[in-house]
Amino acid sequence: MSIDRLLTKVLELYQDVHDDARTEQIYGSTTALLTNLSNPLNLSLLTSQLLIAPAIWGRPDAMRTCYRVISIFNSAAIHVRRNELENAKHKGPRAGGGLGSDAWAAAVLKGADGQSNRWQHLLVFTGVLMGMESGNRNSLSGGMRRTVERAVVTAANLALRKNEPVPQAPAGPVTLALNFTFSLLSESSRASLNCDALIPAATTAMLGADGLEDGYFLGAVDIDVRQAVERFTWEPNSPSYLHITQLEKKPLVSGLGPLSRLLGYAIQNARDSQVILQLQDDLIAFTGKLFQHWQVNNKLSELEISEESIYLTPETISGTWEGLWSFLKKVMYAIVAVSQAVVARSLLDWRLKKHDVAPVVAAKTLHTLRNLYFISSRNGSDSFQVYQFTYLTSLDTLSRFGDASAAFLEEIKPNTEGTIPFHPLHRTLDLFYLNVAEHLPLHLPPEACDKLIIQPAITYLTNAAAPLSPRMMELFESAHSAVLSVLSCPHNAPITVKIVPFYAETLFSSFPKHISPRQFRLAFKTVMQILSPPFPIAASHPQLAETLLEMVRYRASIAGQDPNGQAPLPPPPAADPLEAQEPMSEQSTLVLTLIDALPFLQLDIFEDWMTLAAHAVNEIRDSALREVVKRRFWEVLVSGEMDVERAAIGVAWWGTKGGREAVLFGRAPERQEEMYMMSGALSRPERGSKL
């Protein structure tokens, strides 16, 4: 069929809606015509008619149609450029229509006329720019490329503009086109984008029906979960999983990474800060729905990570289960990337830095991260740099405002009073709560610290059972950290006096079953710092620190009489790089704890406790464990951990008061000449120190 007859036939087919097979033929014929037409007027006519053709736009899947239109012009542009290069190399019959890239692009752009909508023009311009310039093809001249870029930006801005009573352009196609072209636009072209209008449109496209469907895809999983021989199975061919795989193939979902970068650029360059606050509300609403669908509509949410291998079939774990969490992580990465742009903007924008706005931005960001924590808390998924910046910066901002911090903690405080929740998701939220609370006590009044931090943490300190699951271990450690953060604040001295005895007893009862030697030593060292100068509690309750030391020394002596207390403890998990590699027992750890506390003791008891610690060192029977403790004793003396006064006392004690002998030998050794003396010999008088 000649090219002119094909053009006539395609223009006729444009007038009616057809079945899928005929529609695919129309797409293919249109691509062939765009590639081979030699008359620019025919190119413009074909483009103009395509943009109003019922055969194209009468299809039910609008986003798929938009994607296909972009694909048509992208493919045609690639072929036109390829034909142009071939024609330049070989003389003879011309390949294609014979038009150069600039002339072809100009003819196509003219076809985007007033009969069609601006957002439809944007799809055409996107296909042309992608086909000519992506992959470093550099097909267009500098002037024509600037023209096409300007056409893309102008069409996008006009499509996004609110122009009553004309209905606003659908957000999905505009966002899809800009998502494809953003990386190809020059800085000057990007600067012309209407970011204030782009943010709500891109957010709607990303989170709504054209993108992540408001998280409803999670709600259908429970229907397809079946029980098979005391385990649950979720088949790969189930409707819910097939829907998720189809969802991943959506253009906007498969391009979540570039889309988050597009939104990030718009956030950084928007003029109206209110659209950023509205964006945060949209993110909170979406992540809240995602969490609710997972919690309410899915029985699999009742499984802890450590229980998955028990209750799920191996095929489910390696198939649908892994695929689901992989997709959820992609969603989480995109949401966090957008939140990171908001947080970065809030550090520079004076309107977002105001005292009545900054804590609101930080709290909204933390609400979003809390809703995503059931995803980000799996297997260290929250350890990437963008997440840490977003999380820690929001905490730093919120912690400066005591009232806002208290209000935020009150809003997300665990509902269960004094009992550990049964549902794993609730425990996950408690873990997020404790991790956040650890950073906020500095500007909270003592009453708020007690109510909002100490009491929720005590729930996990007093109800810990052995052995702990990995998640319960995280909660237990976070509860310790939260309590220590409260005790470390000088203004919380009234709470410290009441809590320290209870907390010390909790430490002793938890070690070594629930906390490692390093964790025990660090926690006790922190408590000793809190009870020592310059903290005010050191003056009001000077006996408290020494009482705790007596408890440690007593526990060490008890452990020395117990074979289990003398035996080396199991090595820490290899995944924890902070754990010491030297062998330790319960007894040696307690003695090391005594030594760690020495630099913080008051001067009037400092020397006495050095002697007591030295005696405790030599009560350790295992020589290898004892040598580890001796090295630590020497390290405390010489490493600069002590201030000038304590260091001077320590040097004198080591050199002239028997400290060296007490540490190294357990007692001052007898002189050889006193052990063997000739009968009738004169004894040598003791020489005093000349120092």
Q: Residue locations for each model-derived region?
A:
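Hydrophobic residues within the alpha-helices of tandem HEAT/HEAT-like
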Residues: 34, 73-80, 125-133, 181-182, ...
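Buried hydrophobic core positions in alpha-solenoid tandem helical repeats
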Residues: 10, 108, 457-461, 503, ...
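Eukaryotic alpha-helical solenoid repeat scaffolds
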Residues: 397-434, 467, 475-478, 519-523, ...
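Extended alpha-helical scaffolding regions
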Residues: 260-264, 282-283, 288-312, 336-339, ...
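Short inter-helical turns and helix N-cap capping residues of alpha-solenoid HEAT/ARM repeat scaffolds
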Residues: 426, 456, 461-472, 476, ...
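Extended alpha-helical scaffold segments
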Residues: 39-469, 608, 626-627, 643-652, ...
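Alpha-solenoid helical repeat scaffolds
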Residues: 25, 65-68, 334, 428, ...
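N-terminal alpha-helical scaffolding segments that mark the starts
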Residues: 1-56, 623-624, 628-629, 658
